[in-house]
Amino acid sequence: MLETDSQRLRVVEDSLGKINVPLERYYGAQTARSLGNFNVCTRSDTMPLQIVYSLAMIKEVAACTNFKLGRISSKLSDAIVKACREVYHGQHDNEFPLVIWQTGSGTQTNMNVNEVLSSRASELIDGSRSSRLTVHPNDHVNLGQSSNDIFPTAMNLSIAMETAWKVLPSLNHLINVLKIKMHEFMNVIKIGRTHMQDAVPMSVGQELSGYVSQLQQAVDSIKSQLPLICHLAVGGTAVGTGLNCSKGFDEELCVSLTQLTDRLYRTMYKESTPVVDLIFKPAENKFAALAGHDALLQLSGCFNTTATALMRLSNDFCLLSSGPNCGLSEFVLPANEPGSSIMPGKVNPTQCESLRMVCLQIMGNHFTTSMAASQGQLELNVCKPLIAANLLHTCELLTDSTRCFADKCVRDLQLNREKIQEYVDKSLMLVTVLTPHIGYDLSAKLVQHASKFKKGLRESAIELNLLCGEKFDEIVKPMEMAFPHNNK
């Protein structure tokens, strides 16, 4: 692309240094930095291409299945298969202009795909385009199918692939980067805080381990939901009875779809092992599969829970890095771009703020998905495109933002160790370890004395004749307080 052509770049400079900008662009350094630092989900209201590609994959295995069942010839099947592969490899993206604001069953998009495949397959057979189609969009490409069962099948297929192949690896990447920092800072003692007030000592590594555990639980929850997403509506046709669909069509298609997705994964991600194997099966009850999308809603709930964990992570990083001179200033976040158009030298926690907004959007997507999933009327849910678009949007947001946050924020996280130690030395909550020795009431009196006269705990304990200095030092050891059971 022109933007990455090294022969057509100009060098511009801001307070953080030099950066390349495409020669033909009017924007400057800070815009270029933002483009590099926030490559998170660009979208519109057109039907997501993931749905189009999934429909093409389904049409491919449907053509093969219909050939095996003797319903179409090998000539038609081969042409449809070739056309399908061109579509899901992105060769005809401009042929799919429809928006999600269409019929609630996704019929228009299903027919859009049928028409494109019909025209291209006919062209492959006849050698030229013609208004007379050898391959019919309904009779051949859509054989044994209805929009009512095929569109929800494409929904589940696309969301399963996005989740297993992109969302989970990105979340695992963030977890792994956090783990590196967790081990690096495990023995750095700081003051914990509850209710935003000083509490007892802990280590920075322990604090980071909390984020790791929350995110790991989120990953496990998402993974547990994927087998249910792999139960497909295909074979239900119009209302769930399977009218006009051959017996065994759904089972054969699911087996073939499992094999196709496995081949595609190994082609796209040659050296990696999938986080979860996608094994597709016909839905046990096709009536429920057409009228309800409970599995997708539950997955959306898992994403929503993940967003709450990420929100805490981003907010805490932002708070702990506040300052640098007039805030907590325990964390030192990487300076990715200048922070203010009016205050020179200011650097803001931009990755934290970006992730925070992503989390809010994911929560909003979940609310919309919840409402849309409730719109099953009699035998059909009629908000399918909206459910698909919101979940795929969430998948893209999670994939991009977690990787960005890991690489642009967590990876280069540093500590202001002097400030952290200063807080430990000043904390009156170290008194907690004294309560087994002098009791709660005297410990409270000690804190009140130290606070009133602006003195340290040790000095105050000696003045009040509660403990001698040697005994105080023997008891009050922040490292041992942080690891009372030696579980470093």
Swiss-Prot record:
The temperature dependence reads: Has a melting temperature (Tm) of 49.08 degrees Celsius with the highest thermal stability around pH 7.5. Thermal stability increases with increasing NaCl concentration. Both sodium acetate buffer and glycerol promote thermal stabilization.
Q: Where does (S)-malate bind?
A: S105, S147, N148, T194, H195, S341, K346, N348
The catalytic activity of this protein is classed by the Enzyme Commission as 4.2.1.2
What family is reported?
Belongs to the class-II fumarase/aspartase family. Fumarase subfamily.
Subunit info here reads:
Homotetramer.
Q: Which residues form the active site?
A: H195, S340
Q: This protein's superkingdom?
A: Eukaryota
Q: Does the keyword Acetylation apply?
A: no
List the record's Gene Ontology CC terms alphabetically. Answer: cytosol; mitochondrion
Q: Which reaction does it catalyse?
A: (S)-malate = fumarate + H2O
The name this protein carries in UniProt is Fumarate hydratase
Check the record and name the Pfam families matching this protein.
FumaraseC_C (PF10415), Lyase_1 (PF00206)
Report the transmembrane regions from the record.
none
